[in-house]
Regions:
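Catalytic cores of secreted/periplasmic lytic hydrolases that degrade extracellular macromolecules
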Residues: 1-198
Length: 198
């Protein structure tokens, strides 16, 4: 279950990179992480934090291009190899969650496999032992011993966000007058309709 809220996640993403490169609105991507991760009992806030680490807060700039909807570097090995591409952001998020499951679960995902590297990663993990904490991704998902620390640092920044509240404009005398005028107009129209029916 997520600890960070969706609103905090959106606020952090927009603060970290106001010019995100995504094929959908930020809010939609966050919703997709919550839907896809919850279905598979994965923490959506941590999966999203991993995605932010992998994509440079959706700046990309590495081997993967934003239109690939590849939010976790699936299939990239450096040297310009683009990695996997997905038709929609939802499929990209689903592939990310499935790839996490390949590392952490012995059972298969509940949805049709869209992660092209699922079987390879899953078979290796079954042979060597599944990862049972996020820190187990160090040196397995990505090279280096501080990979998970980057994910956790990003997650802490998400938690520190104040959700962006919609702007509420104070009522002015003019706006109240306009509202009352509309009410009177509506009452008058209803009255006219009732008169017509008599």
């Amino acid at each position: 279950e997520a600890i960070a809220s969706k609103a905090q996640a959106v606020a952090y993403i927009l603060a970290a990179n106001p010019a995100v490169k995504l094929a959908c609105p930020v809010e939609e991507l966050v919703d997709l992480y919550w839907q896809e991760a919850k279905r598979e009992n994965v923490r959506p806030d941590l999966a999203l934090a991993q995605s932010l680490v992998e994509t440079g807060a959706y700046r990309y700039g590495g081997d993967v291009l934003h239109h690939q909807n590849n939010f976790c570097g699936l299939g990239t090995i450096g040297g310009g190899v683009r990695g996997a591409s997905f038709a929609t952001p939802q499929l990209g998020v689903r592939a990310h969650i499935q790839h996490l499951l390949a590392y952490t679960q012995t059972k298969r995902p509940s949805t049709v496999i869209v992660d092209p590297r699922y079987d390879l990663a899953h078979n290796i993990r079954l042979e060597r032992g599944v990862v049972n904490t996020w820190y187990g991704l160090n040196g397995t998902w990505a090279m280096g011993s501080l990979y998970c620390e980057k994910i956790m640092a990003t997650y802490q920044k998400i938690l520190a966000q104040q959700p962006v509240e919609p702007e509420i404009k104070p009522a002015t005398a003019e706006s109240v007058k306009e509202k009352n005028k509309k009410k009177r107009s509506m009452k008058q129209r209803v009255s006219e309709i009732l008169q017509e029916k008599k």
